[in-house]
Amino acid sequence: MKTKIFNTFSISVKAKKIISVYSEIELLQSWQKASAKDPVLFLGSGSNTLFLENYQGTIILNRIKGFHVKENNFFWNIHVCSGELWHNIVTICVNKGISGLENLSWIPGYTGAAPIQNIGAYGVEFKQVCSYVDFIFLETGEKVRLSSQECNFGYRKSIFNSSKKFFNYAIVAIGLKLKKKWKACLNYTDLSFLEKEYVSPKKIYNKIFYIRKEKIPNPVYFGNAGSFFKNPLISSKQAKKILKNYPKAPCFKQLNGNVKFSAGWIIEACGLKGYKLGKAAVYHKQASIIINTGSATGYEIAYLAKYIFCIVKKNFSIQLEPEVKFISKIGEIKASKIIS
């Protein structure tokens, strides 16, 4: 009997089998047993995943729990197991007076996914608070710890999703290092009006809740994965051409000379805000989000993403890259095979 897969896109898909694991040993044994005969996929909350069709294998849900804090005069050092919900960890820290994670609040998903894509929001990235990542090579059972520097973090990437070495592995814990000498990060436009003299981690946390509530639809009503595309990084030369025609386009200069543009703004500038294709649509409040308006299939969502990709490439000579992982019947596939 196949089991229904929960995913925030609300795509109706099933897997051959779904297993929840609560310890490293259980995770390793479950993978070794299942992988002997079927494809295996690790899944958190299904919040950044697009299932194109039913999955013909076993899904393992990592639910390994644990949260431990050590501190000194300068830092909070926190060890978090990968089966903890990321937002719950942020909430616990804010409520305990531990600062540094508040800009990363209300991000769905489990902690184990945070380092893979180097999650980021409102001016802060995971790499800025990461001390280490613990993972297991599943074929050998070897447990390894990488420092933050060894993880090779970049914009929405890390060694875990950009190196062929990391194929059969599972993240089991992360380390966070948070400065006690707190400085508010208010670089993001919607946070910039907060008064620095009176701002606190709790105020930032609460403000981000209202921002996200306004911009991101509730998956209960409209299935979605938040921002579907990464904000593109382009050369300064190409950026100048765009800014000549759109002088108010939101963009941010990077240390390496490139310029980051808002994917949502680019999509909206192409006239695609609110555009519908079957049961899939570009969200009318935030063009970077693709929603399931009812009973869309995974392929309908993907076809809309492909249409957006083509229009943006035609109008701006920019190739958008999905943040969302595409899952076929036997596992993850490159999004470029579907949308480009």
Curated annotation (Swiss-Prot):
Cofactors (names): FAD
This protein's pathway: Cell wall biogenesis; peptidoglycan biosynthesis
Enzyme Commission identifier(s): 1.3.1.98
Catalytic activity, reaction form: UDP-N-acetyl-alpha-D-muramate + NADP(+) = UDP-N-acetyl-3-O-(1-carboxyvinyl)-alpha-D-glucosamine + NADPH + H(+)
MF annotations from Gene Ontology: FAD binding; UDP-N-acetylmuramate dehydrogenase activity
Keyword check for Oxidoreductase: yes
Function description: Cell wall formation.
Protein's UniProt name: UDP-N-acetylenolpyruvoylglucosamine reductase
Organism: Wigglesworthia glossinidia brevipalpis
Gene this chain is encoded by: murB
